[in-house]
Amino acid sequence: MAEAAALVWIRGPGFGCKAVRCASARCTVRDFIHRHCQDQNVPVENFFVKCNGALIYTSDTVQHGAVYSLEPRLCGGKGGFGSMLRALGAQIEKTTNREACRDLSGRRLRDVNHEKAMAEWVKQQAEREAEKEQKRLERLQRKLVEPKHCFTSPDYQQQCHEMAERLEDSVLKGMQAASSKMVSAEISENRKRQWPTKSQTDREASAGKRRYFWLGMEGLETAEGSSSESSDDDSEEAPSTSGMGFHAPKIGGSGVEMAAKFPSGSQRARVVNTDPGSPEQLQIPVTDSGRHISEDSCAELGESKEHMESRMVTETEETQEKKAESREPIEEEPTGAGLNKDKETEERTDGERVAEVACEERENVAVAKLQESQPGNAVIDKETIDLLAFTSVAELELLGLEKLKCELMALGLKCGGTLQERAARLFSVRGLAKEQIDPALFAKPLKGKKK
């Protein structure tokens, strides 16, 4: 007896569900699916078969009365969506902040936690106040405690004791020294005020004769009259305020012999007659500053301080008058002195010449210093050099900075820079006219100040 054909149901997209009879009971799922797809004109590769919701193999034998579903295959994508889901799940699991969540009553956990913390803080408020007050009391107690100083250093006490003793000794010694100095000062002043053993007339005569200056021919007659009465004793050397050593002249019946050493500086010295007994008096240098004689020399000559000051004023006035008169020619008066007067006149004229030479040297030095101290106001009146006579920059460098500066300023060029730069700038314009010189080398004109 032939086997009965199996009857199965096929359900798929587009045609619903329909019954299909297989050729035999041993027919496979692949055979009747292939025949059905050929009838529907669709490719078999686009479907997979399910039976009772489960995938079946196409090699299985069909079951009578079973329902087979044809499920279309979906086009597969790139993938990666699953990895995104896995990463998001990991993040959700790692977070511990649940404050945004709500509890069963619908309140957010953030508000619930805040209320709990506030209640706890209110409970601890009293404890905090008590702790703060305790700290304040402890701080106040530390401030009230007196410092514990301990001065038990024997070395310090010994030093204080020795210092007090030394102080007392020093005060006593200082008082003794001060009293001894006062006594010595009084004695020395009394000695200065004592006059030498001479009559009042001799002192007045000597004071009057000291006013004569040895600068001209004045007073020769008075000197001749008193020279016969002078002795042959050597006079003492008079001290000098300017540090010059002068030898006193030897007074004799034949004439006057003197030697004076003038200083090496530029100071001008005048000679003053100081010996009251002769015209060839002791020579003392008098400077232009007005400081004629030191107090020591006045003490030796027996003069008081008041007399010295008045004589200094008188000598200064007479010096100015006789300085102008000494420049005029003076005729020698006929006298009976002869060779003595001629010799004395020669010595005086020699002294005047030396004084005038020293004065001129001092004036020249002062003018030179004034020119050096005001380099900016100096007038460039030197002759310009011939640049064609120089063949290299090195030769121009031998002129020096100031000479190169003057030459550059005379040409209107920039005068700054080092010695080499100035020499190179001046050598570059050698033999060129002013129109041929590079304009960059000219100095910029001075601009007036803005008001």
From Swiss-Prot:
Localization per record: Nucleus; Cytoplasm
GO BP term, pick one: cell division
Motif (PIP-box): 39-52
Description of post-translational modifications: Upon binding to PCNA, the N-terminal UBL (ubiquitin-like) propeptide is cleaved at Gly-77 by an unidentified deubiquitinating enzyme; the resulting mature SDE2 is degraded by the DCX(DTL) complex in a cell cycle- and DNA damage dependent manner.
Domain of life: Eukaryota
One cellular component (GO) term of this entry: nucleus
Principal location listed in the UniProt entry: nucleus
Region of interest (Disordered), residue spans: 182-210, 222-354
Basic and acidic residues composition bias: residue spans: 302-329, 340-354
Listed GO MF terms: DNA binding; snoRNA binding
Location of the SAP domain: 396-430
Positions of the propeptide segment: 1-77
Positions of modified residues (Phosphoserine): S266, S278, S326
Homology family: Belongs to the SDE2 family.
Biological role stated in the UniProt entry: Inhibits translesion DNA synthesis by preventing monoubiquitination of PCNA, this is necessary to counteract damage due to ultraviolet light-induced replication stress. SDE2 is cleaved following PCNA binding, and its complete degradation is necessary to allow S-phase progression following DNA damage. Plays a role in pre-mRNA splicing by facilitating excision of relatively short introns featuring weak 3'-splice sites (ss) and high GC content. May recruit CACTIN to the spliceosome.
Protein name: Splicing regulator SDE2
Originating species: Pongo abelii (Sumatran orangutan)
Biological classification of the source: Eukaryota, Metazoa, Chordata, Craniata, Vertebrata
